[in-house]
């Protein structure tokens, strides 16, 4: 909400109903608050009641990739541009989404969060090449490739899980062929849009990146967040 977001859509599977229950299990929260009289839980419940008015859920029951997950929201998204956040990629200490929205409002185009990664790990990321520098932290993107091999990667500049995308990407995703691992990759559709002349900006964010995509990374991230 600090970034000005007014509607949130969670894309979950039937196995992840616990996320939905977190927002809608009023009886549980009221029981715990009454029993423990914990002010922190009461404050958290107050936040949840506020946010759940903004939230919708859609289901991706078969894991067919990030692109397929985003496509599930097609009927809900009404604006020309929308923000996508991947839960495996956390950015703390600075509000990356707010910074990206500010850039989008100025440049009127798509924006993606980015950072330098170890050259030996480029095959884990969407990797892009720069077309033109805007300033030291923002660049127009020339091309982007999903998980390239180390030798053919255009750089070690990686896209991190924050995207401001145009609504027209849904047409690309609908017709997108399966990519690596048999999944629909959002990077492939972004690449097609760039080839069509759509402008994309990479934003090197100021916050701290936490990788929650592995159990080891999740544990480290939990420790880091609990330091606050």
For every predicted segment, state its role.
Residues 24-25:
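Conserved N-terminal/central alpha/beta ligand/cofactor-binding core
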Residues 83, 97, 101, 105, ...:
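Catalytic-core segments of class I nucleotidyltransferases/pyrophosphorylases
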Residues 1-10:
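A short, N-terminal amphipathic alpha-helix
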Residues 19, 29-32, 41-131, 174-176:
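Conserved beta-loop-beta/alpha segment of the NTase-like Rossmann-fold superfamily
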Residues 18-19, 68, 189, 220:
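Phosphate- and divalent-cation-binding pockets in alpha/beta enzyme and binding domains
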Residues 9-13, 113-114:
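Short internal beta-strands
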């Amino acid at each position: 909400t600090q970034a000005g977001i007014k509607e949130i859509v969670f894309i979950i599977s039937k196995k992840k109903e616990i996320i939905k229950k977190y927002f809608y299990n009023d009886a549980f929260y009221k029981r715990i608050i009454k029993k423990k009289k914990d002010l922190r839980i009461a404050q958290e419940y107050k936040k949840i009641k506020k946010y759940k008015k903004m939230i919708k859920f859609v289901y991706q029951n078969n894991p067919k990739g990030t692109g397929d997950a985003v496509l599930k929201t097609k009927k809900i998204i009404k604006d020309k541009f929308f923000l996508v956040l991947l839960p495996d990629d956390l950015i703390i200490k600075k509000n990356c989404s707010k910074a990206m929205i500010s850039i989008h409002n100025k440049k009127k185009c798509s924006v993606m969060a980015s950072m330098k990664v170890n050259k030996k790990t480029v095959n884990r990321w969407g990797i892009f090449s720069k077309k033109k520098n805007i300033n030291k932290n923002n660049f127009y993107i020339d091309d982007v490739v999903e998980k390239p091999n180390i030798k053919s990667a255009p750089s070690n500049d990686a896209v991190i899980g924050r995207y401001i995308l145009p609504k027209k990407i849904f047409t690309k995703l609908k017709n997108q062929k399966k990519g690596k691992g048999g999944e629909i990759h959002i990077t492939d559709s972004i690449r097609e849009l760039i080839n069509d002349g759509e402008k994309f900006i990479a934003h090197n964010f100021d916050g701290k990146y936490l990788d929650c995509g592995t159990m080891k990374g999740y544990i480290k991230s939990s420790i880091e967040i609990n330091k606050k």
